[in-house]
């Protein structure tokens, strides 16, 4: 029986046509989301200006920041966001991943439109996924990082930062700290000047001054308290009966004497605490020429402890000899209208990048770019070496050529799948600019893009759950003025 000439044949044909239309619509939706960041790829130096749901102004060229602040409801676009977050863990390659997804979907829709079933194309794409490592390894360049050679670090970060001034200051900070850790390279944002005025300063910088009269210290011992320098107050209320003025004076003197003895018993030259500093304590600390600094963040308290050494004490008590740290210098400096304090340790090297710009949104983006550069190096450098590939689109062109050559030696659907990947990679422009990309980031982006597109064409339907409607309005008592009889 010839099904094609029957009513059943028409139903099958219509079903296949509906499936193509559905995937075309879904693919177009995902491509619209991808096009949000398409113009940011390469050396465009463009950014997106975003006003999020809280009214905050953001300026960013990173897909993770853009998608996090743009409300989306489509399940596949949300899945795309999850893959972008996975790329951010590696540090680089998120924009390349998004653009490649868009191009792969376009090529896949053309192939499916010519008769290939979506499920079949998806399985062929997953097969091609396994060969990426072999093809990419042929284009790998091993590069050694040398802290003494700034150019060896610049070579890696040039394609990541895409900003000459930002690249220079990050490279200088890394070469001085001899580390890629964000704990060894801190960032201080100053809302004045421009990025060209940014510089590197030794030590950890805080945007506040010491509390007392003493603003500077050299070669001193430190004591860190995770509590306020304040008179302890009990939880329960109590009543003290005083009959005469002399009793009140005696009580006050006893309290002052106790505080004075406690301050004198603290043998540290620099005292760091996490709460308020009482005026009585501050008065005795000033007389003892002790520097007092307040840190409100528990994370910064932990960092300063790692920098200076010693222990964090939870109660206000005289520290043991082994509980105190050592500081080489505590100094203050001024930038714009704000004064800052820096702590320098002789045992551990920490450097702070003082980033300057008059616009807060630009400052925040520069900070994100610095963190991105540090993540790229810390996640991808192993044994002092990092894998690189030719940048400026040359890696994509060569990989495209490799996939197209392989497709020529194959037949059937597999040939179409390889050709689809080759064409998608071939859409990226290339130039002769001497820049390099991170090998691991490129390979992960290729794998994730194929995985995402395969998932898209394996999804028969998607569901969106509605959030529960919470009745939080006031109660309407319509008969409030009627008396009960």
Curated annotation (Swiss-Prot):
<dbReference type="GO" id="GO:0140662">
    <property type="term" value="F:ATP-dependent protein folding chaperone"/>
</dbReference>
<keyword id="KW-0547">Nucleotide-binding</keyword>
<dbReference type="InterPro" id="IPR002423">
    <property type="entry name" value="Cpn60/GroEL/TCP-1"/>
</dbReference>
<dbReference type="InterPro" id="IPR017998">
    <property type="entry name" value="Chaperone_TCP-1"/>
</dbReference>
<keyword id="KW-0067">ATP-binding</keyword>
<dbReference type="GO" id="GO:0005524">
    <property type="term" value="F:ATP binding"/>
</dbReference>
<dbReference type="InterPro" id="IPR027413">
    <property type="entry name" value="GROEL-like_equatorial_sf"/>
</dbReference>
<comment type="subunit">
    <text>Component of the T-complex protein 1 (TCP1) complex.</text>
</comment>
<dbReference type="InterPro" id="IPR027410">
    <property type="entry name" value="TCP-1-like_intermed_sf"/>
</dbReference>
<dbReference type="GO" id="GO:0005737">
    <property type="term" value="C:cytoplasm"/>
</dbReference>
<comment type="similarity">
    <text>Belongs to the TCP-1 chaperonin family.</text>
</comment>
<dbReference type="InterPro" id="IPR027409">
    <property type="entry name" value="GroEL-like_apical_dom_sf"/>
</dbReference>
<keyword id="KW-0963">Cytoplasm</keyword>
<dbReference type="Pfam" id="PF00118">
    <property type="entry name" value="Cpn60_TCP1"/>
</dbReference>
<keyword id="KW-0143">Chaperone</keyword>
<comment type="function">
    <text>Molecular chaperone; assists the folding of proteins upon ATP hydrolysis.</text>
</comment>
<protein>
    <recommendedName>
        <fullName>T-complex protein 1 subunit theta</fullName>
    </recommendedName>
</protein>
């Amino acid at each position: 029986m010839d099904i094609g000439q029957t009513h059943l044949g028409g139903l099958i044909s219509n079903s296949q046509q509906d499936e193509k239309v559905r995937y075309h619509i879904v693919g177009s939706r995902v491509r619209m989301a991808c096009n949000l960041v398409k113009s940011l790829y390469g050396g465009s130096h463009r950014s997106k200006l975003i006003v999020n749901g809280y009214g905050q102004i953001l300026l960013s060229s990173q897909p993770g920041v853009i998608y996090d602040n743009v409300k989306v409801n489509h399940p596949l676009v949300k899945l795309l966001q999850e893959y972008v977050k996975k790329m951010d863990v590696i540090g680089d390659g998120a924009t390349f991943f998004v653009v490649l997804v868009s191009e792969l979907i376009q090529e896949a829709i053309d192939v499916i439109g010519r008769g290939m079933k979506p499920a079949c194309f998806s399985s062929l794409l997953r097969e091609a996924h396994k060969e990426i490592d072999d093809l990419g390894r042929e284009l790998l360049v091993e590069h050694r990082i040398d802290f003494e050679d700034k150019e060896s670090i610049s070579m890696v970060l040039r394609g990541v930062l895409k900003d000459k001034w930002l690249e220079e200051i990050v490279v200088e900070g890394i070469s001085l700290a001899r580390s890629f850790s964000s704990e060894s390279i801190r960032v201080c944002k100053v809302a004045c000047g421009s990025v060209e005025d940014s510089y590197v300063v030794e030590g950890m910088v805080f945007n506040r001054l010491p509390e007392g009269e003493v603003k500077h210290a050299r070669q001193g011992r430190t004591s860190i308290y995770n509590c306020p320098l304040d008179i302890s107050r009990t939880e329960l209320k109590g009543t003290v009966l005083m009959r005469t003025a002399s009793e009140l004076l005696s009580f006050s003197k006893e309290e002052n004497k106790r505080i004075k003895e406690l301050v004198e018993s603290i043998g540290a030259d620099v005292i760091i605490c996490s709460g308020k500093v009482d005026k009585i304590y501050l008065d005795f600390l000033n007389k003892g020429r002790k520097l007092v600094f307040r840190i409100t963040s528990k994370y910064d308290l932990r960092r300063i402890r790692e920098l200076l050494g010693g222990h964090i004490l939870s109660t206000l008590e005289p520290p043991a000899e082994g509980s105190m740290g050592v500081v080489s210098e505590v100094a203050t400096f001024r930038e714009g209208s704000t004064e800052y304090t820096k702590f320098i340790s002789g045992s551990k090297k920490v450097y702070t990048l003082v980033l300057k710009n008059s616009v807060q949104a630009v400052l925040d983006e520069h900070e994100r770019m610095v963190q991105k550069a540090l993540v790229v190096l810390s996640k991808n450098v192993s044994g002092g070496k990092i894998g690189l590939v030719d940048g400026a689109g040359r890696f994509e062109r060569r990989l495209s050529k490799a996939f197209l050559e392989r497709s020529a030696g194959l037949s059937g659907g597999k040939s179409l799948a390889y050709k689809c990947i080759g064409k998608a990679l071939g859409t990226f422009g290339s130039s002769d600019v001497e820049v390099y990309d991170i090998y691991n980031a490129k390979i992960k982006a290729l794998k994730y893009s194929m995985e995402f597109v395969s998932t898209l064409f394996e999804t028969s339907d998607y569901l969106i759950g509605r959030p529960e409607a919470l009745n939080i309005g006031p109660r309407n008592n319509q008969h409030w003025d009627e008396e009960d009889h």
